[in-house]
Amino acid sequence: MARFLVALALFGVVAMTAASGDAPKEWSGKPWLGKFVAEVSDKSENWEAFVDALGLPDQYPRAQLKTIHSFYKQGEHYHHILSLPDKNINKDIEFTLGQEVEIKHGEHSLKIKYFEDGNKLVADVSIPAKGKSIHDVYDVQGDQLIKSYKVGDVVAKKWFKKVANPAA
């Protein structure tokens, strides 16, 4: 009987682990879930001032790059995938609303806390090594995502188009 209970317990742990790893990606349920693309020619405001306010070195590109933000839910967690295809960057940030997550970006550690403000997704990003904070707001209006970036008093915006089939 004891062996049966141990086997049953182990099966349950294995089944739960497999189930959580195989949870389907949910692309709907919140306005900001989905895939959003900004081409180089798409609209932006105040981008160079934002890059300067961050204190990035001059070799950092001031020009706009094709940028893709994808947000989905899988199990109990959300994922924010940031892609810059021209720079071969593809960063998957797994998060839970209201909880801080720490990631590495290049040589820097970033602390990010995502939360909702009405229908908007907000991310407060801290860069301890630089003593800087970025306040990002993801606001979906129709088939567009308007992302606002704020450092100190400098606010920049970038417009993204929603992709009809985010899994593609």
From Swiss-Prot:
Residues 72-100 are annotated as: SAHS-c2. InterPro entries: Calycin, Fatty_acid-bd. Residues 1-19 form the signal peptide. Residues 113-162 are annotated as: SAHS-c3. It is found in: Secreted. One of its GO terms (molecular function) is lipid binding. GO terms for cellular component: extracellular region. Disruption phenotype: Affects slightly survival under dry conditions but does not affect survival under frozen conditions. Residues 26-57 are annotated as: SAHS-c1. Disulfide bonds: none annotated. Induction: Expression is highly induced during desiccation. It comes from the Eukaryota. Its main location: secreted. The keyword Signal applies. Keywords: Secreted, Signal, Stress response. SAHS-c1, SAHS-c2 and SAHS-c3 are 3 highly conserved regions within the SAHS protein family. Trehalose, a disaccharide essential for several organisms to survive drying, is detected at low levels or not at all in some tardigrade species, indicating that tardigrades possess potentially novel mechanisms for surviving desiccation involving tardigrade-specific intrinsically disordered proteins (TDPs). Belongs to the Secretory-abundant heat soluble protein (SAHS) family. Secreted heat soluble protein acting as a molecular shield in water-deficient condition. Tardigrade-specific intrinsically disordered proteins (TDPs) are essential for desiccation tolerance by forming non-crystalline amorphous solids upon desiccation, and this vitrified state mirrors their protective capabilities. This is Secretory-abundant heat soluble protein 33020. It comes from Hypsibius exemplaris (Freshwater tardigrade).
